[in-house]
């Protein structure tokens, strides 16, 4: 088996593509994987989302929703709010409703804040349907100047200015308490935490900060839709693989990803059984997880800001938190664009132009 390794690695972190293609670290796989075959036909659109410079680089098995809007059902009930899950079922889970609940719940004197976590900036931005850094026609694009992005960022800025966000600047830039995921939901001091389902896909001991999963206190929904949209967009990652440059066994890579693709539905079934039997998930949680995966397949928002270069990732940290950073540092989106758009444009232009062969 010497020198017979497939030499591939996961694309799940969204930090290796298109960087790997730009630097010739990974191979295009159009001549390795038959995306027109029956095995891959159901995910043709997904795989086409990872075309760079005219070539496929990611063997995308399935989507991976990045964020959900987690909440505590007891808090919703005690404050006489409409359950977000019911609002979603009735297609009424909108930015207006979300904002209304956030403004009503927040009370700094009572130490209540509507939003906490590390990812609400990205999660909320993507509800407009556009990532800050996207791919169009096989090229990177900077969407900071999109009107839709400006609209949602203005909504985000207004939330922060109305003091609905927990002030991480006063807590050593950690979330409430010691920074544990879910802190504040179980104690009913936080209304919503945008976070990945991975934080809830764990033992009751690990998820107790959110509330009691077994007793039905923990629930989640997609992030709200824009009022003028008929779609719930989902910040989306990928479950997939990249092939290393000059890998000695591309056939082995092809065999592996084909097996992963064929087994994917059974993997999902096994995961759901574990969630129910080991992690105490309710039927409502299982069904909502399925719903959000379906939404991610239908309305994905893939952001490539961490997959280009360290320089862009660092710059986008500033951009991502511009309108919602706590501690008095928030700026309007207009100011953020004026200060950062040209620098982002330059990095994107260089990345598109300097693709290694």
Language-model segments: residues:
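Extracytoplasmic/periplasmic substrate-recognition and gating elements
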Residues: 209-279
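Short helix-initiation/N-cap motifs at beta->coil->alpha
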Residues: 1, 92-97, 168-186
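Short, solvent-exposed loop/beta-turn-alpha elements that line the ligand-binding surface or hinge
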Residues: 30-42, 87-91, 130-151, 210, ...
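Conserved C-terminal helix/tail region of periplasmic/extracytoplasmic solute-binding proteins
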Residues: 245-254, 262-357
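Glycine-centered hinge/linker elements that transmit conformational signals in sensory
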Residues: 99-102, 137-176
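Hinge/lid segment of periplasmic solute-binding proteins
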Residues: 11-67, 96, 221
């Amino acid at each position: 088996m010497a020198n017979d390794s497939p030499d591939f690695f996961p694309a799940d972190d969204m930090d290796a593509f298109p960087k790997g293609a730009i630097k010739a670290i990974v191979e295009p796989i159009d001549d390795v994987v038959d995306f027109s075959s029956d095995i891959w036909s159901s995910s043709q659109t997904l795989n086409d989302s990872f075309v760079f410079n005219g070539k496929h680089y990611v063997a995308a098995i399935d989507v991976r929703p990045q964020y959900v809007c987690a909440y505590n059902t007891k808090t919703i009930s005690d404050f006489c709010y409409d359950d977000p899950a019911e609002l979603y079922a009735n297609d009424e889970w909108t930015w207006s409703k979300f904002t209304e609940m956030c403004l009503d719940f927040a009370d700094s004197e009572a130490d209540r804040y509507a939003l906490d976590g590390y990812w609400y900036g990205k999660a909320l931005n993507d509800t407009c349907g556009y990532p800050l850094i996207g791919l169009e026609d096989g090229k990177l694009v900077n969407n900071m100047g999109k009107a839709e992005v400006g609209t949602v960022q203005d909504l985000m800025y207004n939330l922060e200015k109305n003091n609905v966000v927990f002030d991480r600047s006063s807590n050593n830039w950690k979330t409430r308490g010691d920074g544990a995921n879910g802190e504040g939901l179980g104690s009913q001091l936080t209304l919503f935490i945008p976070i990945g389902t991975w934080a809830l896909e764990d033992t009751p001991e690990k998820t107790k900060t959110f509330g009691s999963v077994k007793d039905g206190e923990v629930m989640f929904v997609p992030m709200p839709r824009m009022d003028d949209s008929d779609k719930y967009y989902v910040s989306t990652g990928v479950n997939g693989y990249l092939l290393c440059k000059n890998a000695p066994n591309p056939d082995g890579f092809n065999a592996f990803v084909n097996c992963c693709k064929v087994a994917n539905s059974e993997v999902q079934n096994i995961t759901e059984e574990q969630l129910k039997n080991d992690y105490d998930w309710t039927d409502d949680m299982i069904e909502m997880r399925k719903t959000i995966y379906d939404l991610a397949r239908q309305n994905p928002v893939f952001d490539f800001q961490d997959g280009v270069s360290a320089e862009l990732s660092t710059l986008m940290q500033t951009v991502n938190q511009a309108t919602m950073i706590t501690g008095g540092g928030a700026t309007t989106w207009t100011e953020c664009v004026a200060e950062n758009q040209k620098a982002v444009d330059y990095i994107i232009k260089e990345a598109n132009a300097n693709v290694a062969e």
